[in-house]
A protein has these predicted regions:
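Non-catalytic surface loops within mature trypsin-like serine protease
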Residues: 81-83, 100-103, 144, 168
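Residue-level detector of conserved, well-ordered beta-strand and adjacent loop positions
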Residues: 37, 60, 99, 140, ...
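Primarily a LysM-type cell-wall glycan-binding module
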Residues: 21-50, 90-97, 101, 125-133
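Compositionally biased, proline/threonine/alanine/serine-rich low-complexity intrinsically disordered stretches
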Residues: 1-35, 69, 79, 85-90, ...
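Extracellular LysM carbohydrate-binding repeats and other cell-envelope/extracellular binding modules
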Residues: 28, 52-89, 124-136, 163-180
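Short, well-ordered beta-strand segments in beta-rich or mixed alpha/beta enzyme
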Residues: 135-144
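LysM (lysin motif) carbohydrate-binding repeats in extracellular/periplasmic proteins that recognize
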Residues: 37-72, 109-122, 128-130, 144-161
Length: 183
């Protein structure tokens, strides 16, 4: 069998690399799977992830085998990608991320680490073309300037392990899977 010329090999990246690029550019149908442990409440996860309990019926529809039973063992749940329009205040200025995670389980664990302050931050799945799906813990609103974002942060004082950075605002190419209650 004749091998393709070396120049062709360089122009055509390996299949696994092309698949990874395609995944980053493909709009997700789900936010992935999540292993709900015994004693964890599905309603709490849904409120944290989607910003509202209204997505609970959609989650249950994707998981017909879900058992709302305290004695049930761990349950793997498929979480649908429910698209929400970002509030106008988060489409300009800057956003403040207190951590970015590759999986929902990592992000949910970090969000729960905020304890009683967890409602003060938003566990937000975000998809951007070329970057794919990621999970951020965001300040619950956008900021007009970097200075305003840093000022909010100094009053909030996140945990020491928080990986704080500024993000560009949500734009037309960005998909947001969290319902914010700010204007």
């Amino acid at each position: 069998m004749k091998r393709p010329p070396l120049s062709l090999k360089r122009r055509n990246p390996p299949l696994r690399k092309r698949r990874a690029e395609a995944e980053k550019n493909a709009v997700p149908e789900t936010l992935g799977t999540f292993r709900l442990q015994p004693g964890e409440a599905l309603a709490e996860l849904v409120r944290a992830l989607y910003g509202s309990g209204s997505a609970l019926e959609l989650v249950l529809g994707k998981n017909p085998g879900y058992r709302n039973d305290i004695g049930a063992g761990p349950q793997d749940l498929t979480l649908p990608a429910v698209l929400y329009a970002p509030p106008p205040s988060m489409t300009k200025g800057v956003l403040l991320s207190l951590g970015a995670f590759g999986t929902l389980e990592e992000a949910y664990t970090a969000w729960r680490g905020y304890g009683k302050r967890s409602p003060s931050v938003a566990l937000t799945p975000i998809w951007r073309p070329g970057e794919g799906l990621s999970f951020h813990i965001l300040a619950p609103r956008g900021f007009a300037s970097e200075r305003a974002a840093w000022s909010w942060l100094s009053r909030f004082s996140p945990p020491a392990e928080a990986s704080v950075r500024l993000l560009s605002p949500f734009d037309g190419a960005c998909l947001v899977f969290h319902k914010f209650t700010v204007k």
